[in-house]
């Protein structure tokens, strides 16, 4: 991979450069110059129009009404802000999918490892169980504990 590509990836993910001594990674992404959204626009995107929550919301009517009211500059600005939001959500979505997939693979590997080791651990568990003293009744108390008497490798059997 060329050094320009590596640098572009480092810039995109806010990773420290190869000559950087810092080991911290920033969690905020710098927007690209073509899709820059001002903080004012970002706060405007955070405010959701209550009309969107209406069960009878008609997206076509909303867009038509907005297009009639807005100037071409406002339309372009809204387009830029929506594209930037969609790209940000897309990056977040890919990140979530990758992270969860990675955790799923790790959990699957752990379960497979446990299942492979289970057959060797069951006889040792049975030996440890047999070595334990059995509970007995004390002082004629009627509160008794009925402990299983043996372990046959897969399940405990009652007395």
From Swiss-Prot:
Biased amino acid composition, Low complexity: 18-34
Residue ranges of the region described as Disordered: 1-51, 133-159
One GO term describing the cellular component: GARP complex
Cellular compartment(s): Cytoplasm; Nucleus; Golgi apparatus, trans-Golgi network membrane; Endosome membrane
Recorded superkingdom: Eukaryota
In-chain residues carrying the UniProt-annotated modification Phosphoserine: 18, 21
Biased composition (Polar residues): 138-159
Keyword vocabulary terms for this entry: Cytoplasm, Endosome, Golgi apparatus, Membrane, Nucleus, Phosphoprotein, Protein transport, Transport
Record carries keyword Membrane: yes
Record's bilayer topology term: Peripheral membrane protein
Pfam families membership: VPS51_Exo84_N (PF08700)
Keyword presence, Phosphoprotein: yes
Example GO BP: Golgi to vacuole transport
Stated family: Belongs to the VPS51 family.
Record-linked PANTHER family: VACUOLAR PROTEIN SORTING-ASSOCIATED PROTEIN 51 HOMOLOG (PTHR15954:SF4)
Subunit record text: Component of the Golgi-associated retrograde protein (GARP) complex.
Function: Involved in retrograde transport from early and late endosomes to late Golgi, leading to the membrane fusion between late Golgi and endosomal vesicles.
Name of protein: Vacuolar protein sorting-associated protein 51
Species whose genome carries this gene: Schizosaccharomyces pombe (strain 972 / ATCC 24843) (Fission yeast)
Native organism taxonomy: Eukaryota, Fungi, Dikarya, Ascomycota, Taphrinomycotina
């Amino acid at each position: 991979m060329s050094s320009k590509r590596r640098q572009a990836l480092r810039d995109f993910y806010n990773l420290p450069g190869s000559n950087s001594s810092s080991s911290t990674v920033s969690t905020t992404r710098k927007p690209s110059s073509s899709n820059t959204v001002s903080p004012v626009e970002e706060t405007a995107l955070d405010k959701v129009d209550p009309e969107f929550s209406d069960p009878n919301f008609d997206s076509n009517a909303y867009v038509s009404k907005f297009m009639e009211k807005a100037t071409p500059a406002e339309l372009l600005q809204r387009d830029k802000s929506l594209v930037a939001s969609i790209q940000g959500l897309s990056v977040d979505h890919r990140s979530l999918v990758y992270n969860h997939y990675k955790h799923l693979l790790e959990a699957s590997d752990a379960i497979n490892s446990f299942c492979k080791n289970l057959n060797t651990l069951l006889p040792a568990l049975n030996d440890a169980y047999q070595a334990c003293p059995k509970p007995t009744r004390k002082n004629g108390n009627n509160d008794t504990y009925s402990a299983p008497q043996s372990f046959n490798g897969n399940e405990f059997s009652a007395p």
